[in-house]
Amino acid sequence: FDENKAYKALLEAKEEGKIKYIGITSHSLETIEKSIEDEKFSTIQFPYNIIEDQADEVFKKANKKDIGIIVMKPLAGGAIDDAKLAIKYILSKDYIDVVIPGMESIEQVRENVSVLQDTNITKDDELKIQEIRNIMGKRFCRRCEYCLPCPLKINIPQNFLLEGYYARYNLKDWAKERYKSLEVKASACVEC
């Protein structure tokens, strides 16, 4: 991060009293781990939810270093329907400071805030969480790139990402346009 002009500008703004904290957001666990080791950031923001919980140990490490933890994608980009359970799951972790779910209505705000009344996970919640993991676990792309390299050079995570924009976010035209620009389409898959 030393050579990064943006980081230097943020340091300068902090020294001038224009900002209080510098945080980092990433979808790469490796980047988050490095930022914790470097101790240059006051907060980290990373996707975390019932089916994407690979950051647990990294979050605990950050918490021990007094680095704030902000969770994004608590509903896995809309893949998890039960918002209350998803937020409750995250808030039950004492090493997580903030969860930022997307909301489109006052009713969703009320529903999300109501979770704060009780963040303890019950046996029934645990069963629901396991059910979500069983259903989503095998078909949810975590962008880990374990599926790469594809012998046919299909960018598998990118295809899943576009499918999500098409199906969950209803950005059909946007997703189709980007899909057309892919060098190798998912339709070329031979299921090897």
Name each region found by the language model.
Residues 1-70, 75-78:
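Glycine/proline-rich, positively charged
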Residues 38, 56-192:
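Structured C-terminal cap/extension of enzyme domains
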